[in-house]
């Protein structure tokens, strides 16, 4: 096959999963510098790829439209003929589109998902780029405006998740924030509107000044806020992956998940998990110690 000029990239849906596929897309763009990239994903992945400089077209999958919506999507994609198609989802779409060469996802549950995705394009993992989220100038400006002037060392907390078994108690986050506050100028909470129910519990237990941004920002402005933060501490959710992708120090508190496969990818991404995978058994003092040890903060400040 000659150098591909048209490449179709089929990504995933959940925020964290999408972030973990970005090294594949970035590497393909490095190899095939003159190629046109089209991407298939859902509304969340479309937002994450909004400012990606080498994407030509985005095909949005919408489960709510059912079979006819899927059929229409296939027809639209089949109107084009691709030199290469890479499918990291494996829901059958790869077999319905037209492409000279096709790569499917690798089945290996013993390695990290970022590495597994990368192996699908037959590249050695030592060439794997970092995960990435693309932000524009306005998102960065809007994020900076939210932080009081003079505050530079920001601690961002992600106190929600999409499953109750993944949620560390809000009062524990408050205790941790109290322990860490002398190392930071300001504390803020990020998340979607569903996470607001945890904020009153945090507020009562913490008692200090903080900014609640849950449900107030779009995904990319939230990413820009996290990028402006020195450290992100949160539950096993997409926000931890976003933090790592914008090169912010990241610490994840795991419940029943599998850190060896799904932890945020990056050299400054750390995590903790109870041996029985019961998140409520992880005490704030333990998280504090691990954060201090991981990132070298001074306990005597």
Model-derived features: positions:
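Catalytic machinery of carbohydrate-active enzymes
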Residues: 1-301
């Amino acid at each position: 096959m000659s150098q591909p000029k048209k490449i179709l990239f089929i990504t995933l849906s959940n925020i964290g999963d999408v972030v973990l596929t970005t090294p594949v897309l970035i590497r393909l763009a490095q190899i095939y510098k003159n190629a046109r990239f089209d991407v298939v994903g859902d509304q969340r992945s479309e937002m994450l790829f909004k400012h990606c400089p080498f994407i030509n077209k985005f095909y949005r999958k919408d489960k709510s439209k059912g079979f006819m919506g899927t059929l229409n999507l296939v027809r639209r994609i089949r109107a084009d003929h691709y030199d290469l198609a890479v499918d990291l989802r494996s829901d059958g779409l790869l077999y319905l589109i037209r492409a000279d060469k096709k790569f499917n996802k690798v089945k290996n549950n013993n390695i990290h998902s970022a590495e597994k995705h990368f192996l699908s394009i037959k590249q050695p993992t030592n060439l794997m780029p970092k995960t990435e989220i693309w932000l524009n100038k306005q998102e960065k400006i809007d994020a900076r405006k939210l932080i009081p002037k003079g505050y530079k060392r920001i601690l961002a907390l992600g106190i929600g998740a999409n499953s109750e078994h993944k949620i560390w108690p809000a009062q524990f986050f408050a205790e941790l924030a109290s322990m860490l506050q002398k190392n930071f100028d300001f504390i803020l909470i990020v998340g979607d509107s569903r996470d607001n129910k945890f904020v009153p519990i945090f507020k009562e237990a913490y008692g200090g000044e903080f900014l609640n941004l849950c449900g107030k920002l779009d995904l990319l402005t939230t990413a820009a806020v996290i990028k402006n933060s020195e450290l992100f501490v949160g539950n096993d959710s997409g926000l931890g992956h976003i933090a790592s992708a914008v090169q912010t120090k990241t610490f994840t508190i795991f419940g029943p998940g599998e850190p060896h496969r799904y932890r945020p990818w990056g050299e400054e991404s750390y995590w903790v998990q109870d041996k029985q995978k019961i998140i409520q058994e992880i005490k704030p003092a333990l998280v504090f110690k691990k954060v201090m040890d991981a990132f070298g903060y001074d306990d005597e400040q």
